[in-house]
């Protein structure tokens, strides 16, 4: 058995090596890929991302039976409306997320929601697999009680594959380690039998979160704003400064008076845009209301 496993491993490694030899990623092809993902999604690919790009896109080539990156690029550019464009974008987007990531934001959100009348609404601009918008909805549920039933979280992402996972609302139990036992019981169902070790979002929580595909570079955003709060965390780091400025400018009319904009720990929106000022740790308000 050990010999068989070792042989299989060698064959697998050999196959990967052969694939790399058959499918070289030239400098010209990498530059074109970088241009296309920037045009379509605003993502800036640094030179050190080349290996990541290769590893992700080579899967698409294998699936399509294409043996040259030039042929793949020709396929993309032959039809600007091809479904392969979405697969291309999905492959090159990065999705790092967790429940209650950057935890200091959520007490601020809770206090803000309690202080405001009416139906509280939030936009999560990069929902990924759902951990952020569900964390927002849980926070509102805990903070507002019965009033949370009228709150809405709008959750968007450019990657359609991660949105499917988000809508399914199924996670590993270990992914919820930042939740309290009460939150676990109140907002999730535990899997049994073949689903042991998994949890699913309860319908009451899922009903407050609306998922939709959205490209921040799109000319129009089909959103029901303005919002009491916008979460745009760890998104701008993938864009260049002109793109960052354009997006932040478009956030201004989408925030209600007194609204909050939440950023990632490595992002400084007040250095990018004069429209926002720093109210707290990576939390921004509108400068015109300062």
UniProtKB/Swiss-Prot annotation:
Binding site for S-adenosyl-L-methionine: 95, 97, 101, 132, 157, 215-216, 233-234
Keyword annotations of the record: Chemotaxis, Methyltransferase, S-adenosyl-L-methionine, Transferase
E.C. designation(s): 2.1.1.80
Record-linked SMART domains: MeTrc
The reaction(s) this protein catalyses: L-glutamyl-[protein] + S-adenosyl-L-methionine = [protein]-L-glutamate 5-O-methyl ester + S-adenosyl-L-homocysteine
Gene Ontology BP terms: chemotaxis; methylation
Disulphide linkage map: none
Domain of life: Bacteria
Matching InterPro entries: Bact_Chemotaxis_MeTrfase, Chemotaxis_MeTrfase_CheR, CheR_C, CheR_MeTrfase, CheR_N, CheR_N_sf, SAM-dependent_MTases_sf
Enzyme class: transferase
Molecular-function GO terms, alphabetical: protein-glutamate O-methyltransferase activity
Domain CheR-type methyltransferase, chain residue ranges per copy: 18-289
Function: Methylation of the membrane-bound methyl-accepting chemotaxis proteins (MCP) to form gamma-glutamyl methyl ester residues in MCP.
UniProt-recorded name of the protein: Chemotaxis protein methyltransferase
Species of provenance: Klebsiella aerogenes (strain ATCC 13048 / DSM 30053 / CCUG 1429 / JCM 1235 / KCTC 2190 / NBRC 13534 / NCIMB 10102 / NCTC 10006 / CDC 819-56)
Taxon lineage: Bacteria, Pseudomonadati, Pseudomonadota, Gammaproteobacteria, Enterobacterales
């Amino acid at each position: 058995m050990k010999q068989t496993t070792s042989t299989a491993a060698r064959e697998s490694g050999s196959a990967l090596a052969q694939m790399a030899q058959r499918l070289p990623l030239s400098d010209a092809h990498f530059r074109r890929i970088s241009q296309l993902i920037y045009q379509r999604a605003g993502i800036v690919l640094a030179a050190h991302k080349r290996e990541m790009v290769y590893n992700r896109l080579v899967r698409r080539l294998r699936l399509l039976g294409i043996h040259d990156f030039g042929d793949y690029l020709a396929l993309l550019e032959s039809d600007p409306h091809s479904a392969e464009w979405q697969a291309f974008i999905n492959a090159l987007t990065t999705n790092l997320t967790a429940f209650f990531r950057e935890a200091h934001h959520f007490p601020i959100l809770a206090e803000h929601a309690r202080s405001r009348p009416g139906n509280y609404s939030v936009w999560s601009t990069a929902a990924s697999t759902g951990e952020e918008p569900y964390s927002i909805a849980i926070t509102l549920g805990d903070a507002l009680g019965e009033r949370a039933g009228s709150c809405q979280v709008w959750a968007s992402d450019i990657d359609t594959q991660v949105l499917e996972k988000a809508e399914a609302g199924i996670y590993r139990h270990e992914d919820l380690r930042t939740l309290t036992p009460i939150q676990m019981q109140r907002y999730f169902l535990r899997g049994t039998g073949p689903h042991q070790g998994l949890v699913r979002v309860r319908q009451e929580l899922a009903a407050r979160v609306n998922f939709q595909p959205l490209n921040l570079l799109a000319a129009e955003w089909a959103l029901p704003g303005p919002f009491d709060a916008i979460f745009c965390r760890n998104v701008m780091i993938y864009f260049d400064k002109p793109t960052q400025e354009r997006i932040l400018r478009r956030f201004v009319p989408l925030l209600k008076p007194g609204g909050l904009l939440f950023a990632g720990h490595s992002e400084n929106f007040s250095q990018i845009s004069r429209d926002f000022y720093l109210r707290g740790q990576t939390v921004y308000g509108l400068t015109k209301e300062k």
